[in-house]
Amino acid sequence: MGRTRENKEDVVADLKELLKESQLAVIIDYQGLSVAEITDLRRRIRPVGGTCKIAKNTLVRIAVDGDQNWQPMQEYLKGSSAVLLVQEDVGGIVKAYKSFQKDSKKTELRGGVMEGRSLTKDQVEALADLPSKEQLYAQIAGAINSITAKIAIGIKEVPSSVARGLQAYSEKEQGSES
């Protein structure tokens, strides 16, 4: 039994809403996956801020129609397509998908779309090497902390240098008086 028009409109509206909140869309071929495997994929990407949507290519095309950011997605919509939508950790979702792909060996990454640009399979896989938001925060905090430590050492060193200079001068004066 097919979907009703109302149901299809709900799917398109849901996709549009998810796309508004997403930074990246990754399109995969899910042919050959069982329901349990699709559920496993969804379970793996959810903790890193991702959503897996499976809808007819026609409905996905309708959802991205008129939105310049997601237009390039249409070139990847062939056959059995699942769309992985990333709201938060771009690198984390690609890592989660690659882990799933390594275990199942049934899916194929077609490409992705980010900020209106089409990404090839290799470009999407390269996103896995990017540090997560938490790692970037830690790096920034470490850099700020090291700067403040250097400033504190520098401030402490100035009076010490002046004191050593005065001490050397007074010793020199005492030596010349003798």
UniProtKB/Swiss-Prot annotation:
<keyword id="KW-0699">rRNA-binding</keyword>
<dbReference type="GO" id="GO:0003735">
    <property type="term" value="F:structural constituent of ribosome"/>
</dbReference>
<dbReference type="InterPro" id="IPR002363">
    <property type="entry name" value="Ribosomal_uL10_CS_bac"/>
</dbReference>
<dbReference type="InterPro" id="IPR022973">
    <property type="entry name" value="Ribosomal_uL10_bac"/>
</dbReference>
<dbReference type="GO" id="GO:0015934">
    <property type="term" value="C:large ribosomal subunit"/>
</dbReference>
<keyword id="KW-0687">Ribonucleoprotein</keyword>
<comment type="subunit">
    <text>Part of the ribosomal stalk of the 50S ribosomal subunit. The N-terminus interacts with L11 and the large rRNA to form the base of the stalk. The C-terminus forms an elongated spine to which L12 dimers bind in a sequential fashion forming a multimeric L10(L12)X complex.</text>
</comment>
<comment type="function">
    <text>Forms part of the ribosomal stalk, playing a central role in the interaction of the ribosome with GTP-bound translation factors.</text>
</comment>
<comment type="similarity">
    <text>Belongs to the universal ribosomal protein uL10 family.</text>
</comment>
<keyword id="KW-0694">RNA-binding</keyword>
<keyword id="KW-0689">Ribosomal protein</keyword>
<dbReference type="Pfam" id="PF00466">
    <property type="entry name" value="Ribosomal_L10"/>
</dbReference>
<dbReference type="GO" id="GO:0070180">
    <property type="term" value="F:large ribosomal subunit rRNA binding"/>
</dbReference>
<dbReference type="InterPro" id="IPR047865">
    <property type="entry name" value="Ribosomal_uL10_bac_type"/>
</dbReference>
<dbReference type="GO" id="GO:0006412">
    <property type="term" value="P:translation"/>
</dbReference>
<dbReference type="InterPro" id="IPR043141">
    <property type="entry name" value="Ribosomal_uL10-like_sf"/>
</dbReference>
<protein>
    <recommendedName>
        <fullName>Large ribosomal subunit protein uL10</fullName>
    </recommendedName>
</protein>
<dbReference type="InterPro" id="IPR001790">
    <property type="entry name" value="Ribosomal_uL10"/>
</dbReference>
